[in-house]
Each structure stands twice: as C-alpha cells, then as structure tokens.
C-alpha cells in the first residue's frame, strides 16, 4: 500500500442496455436503469436512472426519455457520459479535502468495435476517471 493510495478509489462499472451496476469496495452501490430524461429544447439531462424511468411515457412535450446504450454500447455519447457521471455521484464516499482520483474497470460486450471501445473510455474519462480498463463480457 503506497502513501498516496488514500487519494485513489477504484470502481467497477457494468454498463448494460437495461441496467448499470457500479461496484465499490466489493459492494454493489449503484443498480439503476440505464435511462436518461432530457429537456428537448435545451438537451440538458434532467434525470437519470430510476427518476428518469418514472418519467418514461408521461405526457410532457419538453421531456423525452432515452436509453443512451444500444446492445451494450454507447449510442449517445453526451447522454451516456452524463448518466455515468450521475451514477458515480451516487457512490457513497468518504468526506475528504480532496476528491480522490478514480480508477475504473468497465465491462463491455464482446465483439464491440474499436470506435465503440474508444467511446466507452472517453465517456469514463469525461466522467472523471483517471485510469480506465475495459473487460469483455
């Protein structure tokens, strides 16, 4: 264990078309539907996961719900990035003066293209990951 290990946290993410799981400290800390609700006019993501699923099918002209992952890969980069970032914020974390660097292991389906792999890595990095490793299902 190194001196600066307290400044790093490791998480595992299973990005699924239906649900996303995040494991932190050997526990499932996030188990949410992979769905986002967006404001149609601004494109702003207003809800993710269970809150977005509750909005699905409701008649409101300014809100649409969508699944940013198709067949286990990223179909909408910005929405998936915001969804991942929101799910990471749901992780119970220790209070600290500094935010620890995140190391992520992301599970992706086998057979994805290099472009799709790059989209997952970019999305995780934009969501705050310092290091990203991909594991094929």
Residue ranges, per PLM feature:
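Nucleotide/phosphate-binding catalytic cleft detector across ATP-hydrolyzing
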Residues: 1-137
């Amino acid at each position: 264990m190194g001196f600066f290990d307290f400044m790093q946290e490791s998480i595992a993410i299973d990005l699924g078309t239906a649900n996303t799981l995040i494991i932190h400290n050997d526990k499932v800390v996030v188990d949410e539907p992979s769905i986002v609700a967006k404001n149609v006019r601004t494109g702003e993501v207003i809800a993710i996961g269970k809150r977005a699923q509750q909005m699905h099918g409701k008649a409101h002209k300014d809100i649409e719900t969508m699944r940013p992952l198709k067949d286990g890969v990223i179909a909408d980069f910005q929405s998936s990035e915001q969804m991942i970032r929101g799910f990471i914020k749901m992780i119970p974390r220790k209070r600290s003066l500094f935010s620890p660097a995140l190391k992520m292991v992301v599970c992706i389906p086998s057979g994805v293209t290099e472009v799709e792999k790059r989209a997952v890595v970019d999305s995780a990095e934009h969501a705050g990951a310092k290091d990203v490793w991909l594991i094929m299902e």
